[in-house]
C-alpha cells in the first residue's frame, strides 16, 4: 500500500489496460444526373462503390424515391450497409449531404455525437443497414443548395469499434535493481569524502554530515541547525556501544537492517534480542523513524518469556506505545504469566519501573475477566499472581496518578 494525500492506495503486482476506441474512415459518393434517377420507385436504390473501414467492407445506399412505399416518394432515403460476410459489427456512423454553395451548411445525421445515449449500433449480418428512411424531403432537396447542376455529393464516415488490450511493456534491455544503498555503503566503508568522525568507545567511525543530516533530524540540527556547529569534525559518543552505532550508521546509508548475527558474532536468540533492543534505543535517540519501526516489529516477532520484561521496560522508558501494549498482552496471557514472573528481567522490571505493575495488573485483570467468573475471584487472581495485596495495589495506583500529574 502507498499513501497519497492521506489515502491508502493499492500497489498491484501487475497491470493491464483495455482501450475501447474506433477505427475511422470516410467515403464520398457523388451522384451525377439526379433527375434521371427519379421515378425508380420506392425501395430501389443507387449503390456506391464498396469501400473498407476497420477491416470491413461498406457501401452507401441512396433511395431517390425513398425506401418506404408509404411515403409516396416524398422523401429521399440514405443508408450505410455492411458489405462483408461478418456478424455483430459495432460501429458509429455519420451521413452528410454536402452543401455545394460554399456556405458549409451541410445536412448531417451523425451517430458519433449520440454514442453515449445507447452505444454504438450493431450490424448483425451482411446487408444490415444504418440510416434514415426520411433523410430529407425531396421537394426541399430539389430547391436547395445540396443539389447543383443535377448533382448530389454524399459523404459517409464509419467508426468501427475495436478493443485493444495492453499489458506490461516488454523491453529488450533489462532494468537493473536500484543499487543506491550499496553505493552509499561503499562510500561509508571507503571513507571517501568523510567530514565527521565519531569516537565510540575504542572505535572511530567516519561519515558524511550531509548524508547523516538527510536521514536524521537530530544530526541535521546538530550540524546545520540554528545552534548547530557545521565546523565540528569529531564527536564523542558515550551512551551507545560501538557495535550498535556501527549498525545504525549502516542503516542510515543503506535503509536496510544489517546482519545482526555478523555484528554480534553470535547466533543466539538472546544476543539478537539484546542487539535489537539497543538499536531501537539508538534509533529513538536520533529520530530514525523507519529503523524504530523495524526494531519494534522484530522485537514483537522474537518476544518470549525470557525477554518480554526487558522489552517492556524499554518500551516504557522510550514510550513505544504499540510495543508496550503488545508486551503487556503477552505477559497477561495465562500461558506466559507464571514463567515471566520467574525471569530475571521481571525482577529488574519491578525495581526499575514499579509504575508498570499497575498497568500490568489492569491488563491481567482484563484477561482474567474473560476467562473466570465471579468478581471477587477475579480480583484475588489478578493481585495474587503479581505478588501484591490489594492495599499495595491501591497505593501503587495513587502513586502512579501523582507521577502523571507531576509530569503533566
UniProtKB/Swiss-Prot annotation:
Family of the protein in this entry: Belongs to the Tdpoz family.
GO molecular function terms listed in the Swiss-Prot or TrEMBL record: identical protein binding
Record's comment describing the protein's domains: The BTB/POZ domain mediates the interaction with some component of ubiquitin ligase complexes.
Membrane-crossing segments per the record: none
Subunit structure comment from the entry: Homodimer or heterodimer with BPM3 and BPM5. Interacts with CUL3A and CUL3B. Interacts with RAP2-4 and RAP2-13. Binds to MYB56 at the promoter of FLOWERING LOCUS T (FT).
Pathway of action: Protein modification; protein ubiquitination
Keywords linked to the UniProt accession: Cytoplasm, Nucleus
Known function: May act as a substrate-specific adapter of an E3 ubiquitin-protein ligase complex (CUL3-RBX1-BTB) which mediates the ubiquitination and subsequent proteasomal degradation of target proteins.
Pfam families: BACK_BPM_SPOP (PF24570), BTB (PF00651), MATH_2 (PF22486)
InterPro entries: BACK_BPM_SPOP, BPM1-6, BPM_C, BTB/POZ_dom, MATH/TRAF_dom, SKP1/BTB/POZ_sf, TRAF-like
Residues annotated as domain BTB: 194-261
Tissue occurrence: Ubiquitous.
Domain MATH: 24-158
Any single biological process term in GO: protein ubiquitination
Record protein name field: BTB/POZ and MATH domain-containing protein 3
Gene3D superfamilies on file: 1.25.40.420, Apoptosis, Tumor Necrosis Factor Receptor Associated Protein 2, Chain A, Potassium Channel Kv1.1, Chain A
Subcellular location: Nucleus; Cytoplasm
GO cellular component: cytosol; nucleus
Amino acid at each position: 500500500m502507498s499513501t497519497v494525500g492521506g489515502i491508502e492506495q493499492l500497489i498491484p503486482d501487475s497491470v493491464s489496460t483495455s482501450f475501447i476506441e474506433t477505427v475511422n474512415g470516410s467515403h464520398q459518393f457523388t451522384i451525377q444526373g439526379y433527375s434521371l434517377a427519379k421515378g425508380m420507385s420506392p425501395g430501389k436504390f443507387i449503390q456506391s462503390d464498396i469501400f473498407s473501414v476497420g477491416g470491413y467492407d461498406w457501401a452507401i445506399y441512396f433511395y431517390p424515391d425513398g425506401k418506404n412505399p408509404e411515403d409516396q416518394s416524398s422523401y429521399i432515403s440514405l443508408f450505410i450497409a455492411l458489405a462483408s460476410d461478418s456478424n455483430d459489427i459495432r460501429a458509429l456512423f455519420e451521413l452528410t449531404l454536402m452543401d455545394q454553395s460554399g456556405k458549409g451548411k451541410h445536412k448531417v445525421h451523425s451517430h458519433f455525437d449520440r454514442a453515449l445515449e445507447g452505444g454504438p449500433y450493431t450490424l448483425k449480418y451482411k446487408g444490415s443497414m444504418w440510416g434514415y428512411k426520411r433523410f430529407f424531403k425531396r421537394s426541399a432537396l430539389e430547391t436547395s443548395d445540396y443539389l447543383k447542376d443535377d448533382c448530389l455529393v454524399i459523404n459517409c464516415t464509419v467508426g468501427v469499434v475495436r478493443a485493444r488490450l495492453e499489458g506490461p511493456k516488454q523491453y529488450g534491455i533489462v532494468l537493473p535493481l536500484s543499487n543506491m544503498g550499496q553505493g552509499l555503503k561503499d562510500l561509508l566503508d571507503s571513507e571517501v569524502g568523510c567530514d565527521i568522525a565519531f569516537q565510540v568507545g575504542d572505535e572511530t567511525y567516519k561519515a558524511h554530515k550531509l548524508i547523516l543530516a538527510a536521514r536524521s533530524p537530530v544530526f541535521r540540527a546538530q550540524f546545520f541547525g540554528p545552534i548547530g556547529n557545521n565546523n565540528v569534525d569529531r564527536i564523542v559518543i558515550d551512551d551507545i556501544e560501538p557495535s550498535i552505532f556501527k549498525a545504525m550508521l549502516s542503516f542510515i546509508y543503506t535503509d536496510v537492517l544489517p546482519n545482526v548475527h555478523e555484528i554480534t558474532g553470535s547466533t543466539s536468540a538472546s544476543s539478537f534480542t539484546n542487539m535489537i533492543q539497543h538499536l531501537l534505543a539508538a534509533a529513538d535517540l536520533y529520530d530514525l523513524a523507519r529503523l524504530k519501526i523495524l526494531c519494534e516489529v522484530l522485537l514483537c516477532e522474537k518476544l518470549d518469556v525470557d525477554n518480554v520484561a526487558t522489552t517492556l521496560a524499554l518500551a516504557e522508558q522510550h514510550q513505544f506505545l504499540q510495543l508496550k501494549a503488545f508486551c503487556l498482552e503477552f505477559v497477561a496471557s495465562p500461558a506466559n504469566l507464571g514463567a515471566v514472573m520467574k525471569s530475571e528481567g521481571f525482577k529488574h522490571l519491578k525495581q526499575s519501573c514499579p509504575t508498570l505493575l499497575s498497568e500490568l495488573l489492569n491488563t491481567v485483570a482484563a484477561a482474567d475477566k474473560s476467562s473466570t467468573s465471579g468478581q471477587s475471584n477475579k480480583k484475588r487472581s489478578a493481585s495474587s499472581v503479581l505478588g501484591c495485596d490489594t492495599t499495595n495495589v491501591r497505593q501503587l495506583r495513587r502513586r502512579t496518578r501523582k507521577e502523571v500529574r507531576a509530569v503533566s
